[in-house]
Each structure stands twice: as C-alpha cells, then as structure tokens.
C-alpha cells in the first residue's frame, strides 16, 4: 500500500510525465505535421484533418486509457446538447451506427401508430452507402431507390415526389462524398 507521501509523489510524477508527453506531441506536430501532410498532395474524397489540438487530445485520451467514450466524449455530448438546444445528446462511434440507431428507433413500439412497420417503404438514394441502406433492410423495411445526379451523386430530389406511395413512411439519405443534398427541398417534401 502506498503511503501518503508516496501517493503524492506518484500523482506528481504522473502529471509531470503526462505533461512531457503532451509537450513532445506538440513539438512533433509543429515540426513534422506539415511534412506528413505534404507527402500526399492529392485531394482525397474523404479523410482526416488532424491539427495540433486534435493530436494532443488523442494522446491525452490514450494516456487516460479511454479510447472510446471517456471525458472528451462526455464534454462533446454536453456541448452538442447545448448547441442543439436539447436535453440529451448521444454520440455514436460511426455514421453507420448512427444510421442503424436512427432507423431502429423509428421502428420502436414506443412510437405507437407512428412507428415504421415491416413492409413500409423508405426512400433512399441509389448511390447510397451500404450503411445507409442496410438498416432499412435489417428492420424489414423496403428501400425505394431514387437515381442520383452526376457529378454530386446526391439524390435527384425532383424524383422523390414521383416515388411516393401510401406505403412511403420515411426518407433516409446521406450526403454523398461530402456534397450536401438539398435539405430544404427534402424537408418540404417530408412535411407536405
């Protein structure tokens, strides 16, 4: 068992070591970060943007041994709840998980007559990712595929109204390759 002064030394050493590691991380990103980015001068359709602050938070979370939903995630969820003016906010590990949670929640018995039921149609984009389409199928709903515009690969909003039937209960689409779809038009179709 640690004595009081040993515990104090342990905590002080832990904090000092952590600060050294974080300072080394800052120096590494400042000195070598631009070189790491310059090696790949192409413009990828997706990827990561990691600056000094993100690198520090990543290393600090690793030192806390919280690699998923630790204090940084709790802070993020609190700030998002405030930003969205909602009581709760729950983050997901990926957009794939978020899509599955969203569709599954819409199939919940807690929604009563408003829940999505087996066989209900869900409009989606023909060029959608499997992670947008799979939750529809997993919940025994019927995807109705709408063609996409080239070169954005987003849904052709003018075709949505033509696809509506009495079995259409939802629209589930994702922005394609960072290109936002016409949200205002989709909202208008959904609320009319």
Residues covered by each model-derived region:
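N-terminal "arm"/small-domain region of PLP-dependent enzymes with the aminotransferase-like
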Residues: 2-67
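PLP-dependent aminotransferase class I/II
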Residues: 27, 48, 74-78, 85-89, ...
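Acidic active-site catalytic centers that drive phospho-/nucleotidyl reactions
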Residues: 54, 77, 147-149
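Phosphate-binding glycine-rich loop
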Residues: 71-121, 134-139, 145
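PLP-dependent aminotransferase-like
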Residues: 108-192
């Amino acid at each position: 068992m640690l004595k009081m002064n040993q515990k104090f030394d342990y905590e002080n050493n832990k904090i000092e070591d952590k600060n050294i590691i974080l300072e080394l991380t800052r120096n590494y990103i400042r000195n070598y970060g631009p070189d790491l980015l310059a090696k790949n001068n192409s413009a990828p359709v997706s990827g990561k943007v990691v600056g000094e602050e993100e690198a520090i938070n990543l290393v600090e979370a690793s030192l806390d041994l919280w690699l998923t939903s630790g204090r940084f995630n709790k802070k993020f969820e609190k700030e998002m709840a405030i930003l969205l003016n909602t009581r709760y906010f729950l983050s997901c590990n990926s957009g794939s998980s978020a899509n599955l949670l969203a569709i599954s929640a819409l199939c919940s018995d807690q929604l009563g007559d408003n829940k999505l039921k087996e066989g209900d149609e869900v409009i989606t984009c023909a060029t959608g990712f499997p992670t947008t389409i799979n939750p529809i199928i997993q919940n025994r709903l019927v995807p109705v595929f709408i063609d996409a515009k080239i070169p954005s690969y987003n849904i052709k909003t003018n075709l949505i109204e033509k696809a509506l039937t009495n079995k259409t209960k939802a629209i589930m689409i994702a922005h394609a390759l960072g290109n936002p779809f016409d949200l205002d038009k989709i909202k208008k179709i959904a609320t009319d």
